[in-house]
Amino acid sequence: MKQESASQSTPPPSLSPAPSSAQPSWGDGDPQALWIFGYGSLVWKPDFAYSDSRVGFVRGYSRRFWQGDTFHRGSDKMPGRVVTLLEDREGCTWGVAYQVRGEQVNEALKYLNVREAVLGGYDTKEVTFYPQDTPDQPLTALAYVATPQNPGYLGPAPEEVIATQILACRGFSGHNLEYLLRLADFMQLCGPQAQDEHLEAIVDAVGTLLPCSYLPEQPLALT
């Protein structure tokens, strides 16, 4: 059985961190703009209007399937497993940052408050986001993070146990397995520099448990 490690998501070796003189900015200098970092379902299903989006990563965090979900990908009787961010000095988590401007800001935050906070149990946190194409120009972004203090938090478990739980759960947004595989699909599209050993181990465990392949109805594509 694979031992859990907080630093399984390795930083991309080909991308160096921003020099100390580079200060993250909130909306490319626009005081009415905001970046929102998604690392779970937001990477393929933001469902809010935005002006720009960039693929990239945040340092100092690892992604873990440690948050329980009783609405989107599970139920009260059978909570699904969705991701949160774990503070990890050596960690690196890939995702998508969306820029919202003007009226989009309030609309996006109102929508995400229900989707992520009320229904998901997530709190907001400020993170530094490094765009894949311009890692020397970091951005300050808002991320939704589930902490151990929220009632839906499930915490660590062996990847095989997490995989079994994911295979059994479904919520109002669909099957928990779809969530897992779409996230894995996104990571493959990011390229070989994007690694997440925790995610990969769960996908491998699902492949062992599942007798046939499961494919999402609509393939994911980065635009």
UniProtKB/Swiss-Prot annotation:
Domain of life of the organism encoding this protein: Eukaryota
GO cellular component, one term: cytosol
Chain sites annotated for binding substrate: I36, F37, G38, Y39, G40, S41
Tissue-wise expression: Widely expressed, with high expression in forebrain and anterior spinal cord. Expressed at intermediate level in the dorsal aorta and heart. Present throughout adult brain (at protein level).
GO MF, one annotated term: glutathione specific gamma-glutamylcyclotransferase activity
Chemical reaction(s) catalysed: glutathione = L-cysteinylglycine + 5-oxo-L-proline
Active site per database record: E116 (proton acceptor)
E.C. code: 4.3.2.7
UniProt region (Disordered), positions on chain: 1-26
UniProtKB keywords: Apoptosis, Cytoplasm, Golgi apparatus, Lyase, Neurogenesis, Notch signaling pathway, Unfolded protein response
Subcellular location(s) per record: Cytoplasm, Cytosol; Golgi apparatus, trans-Golgi network
InterPro entries on file: ChaC, GGCT-like, GGCT-like_sf
GO annotation terms (biological process): glutathione catabolic process; intrinsic apoptotic signaling pathway in response to endoplasmic reticulum stress; negative regulation of Notch signaling pathway; negative regulation of protein processing; neurogenesis; Notch signaling pathway; response to caloric restriction; response to unfolded protein
Effect of E116Q: Loss of catalytic activity against glutathione
Subunit structure: Interacts with NOTCH1 (via extracellular region).
Function: Catalyzes the cleavage of glutathione into 5-oxo-L-proline and a Cys-Gly dipeptide. Acts specifically on glutathione, but not on other gamma-glutamyl peptides. Glutathione depletion is an important factor for apoptosis initiation and execution. Acts as a pro-apoptotic component of the unfolded protein response pathway by mediating the pro-apoptotic effects of the ATF4-ATF3-DDIT3/CHOP cascade.
Family to which the UniProt record says this protein belongs: Belongs to the gamma-glutamylcyclotransferase family. ChaC subfamily.
Protein name: Glutathione-specific gamma-glutamylcyclotransferase 1
Organism: Mus musculus (Mouse)
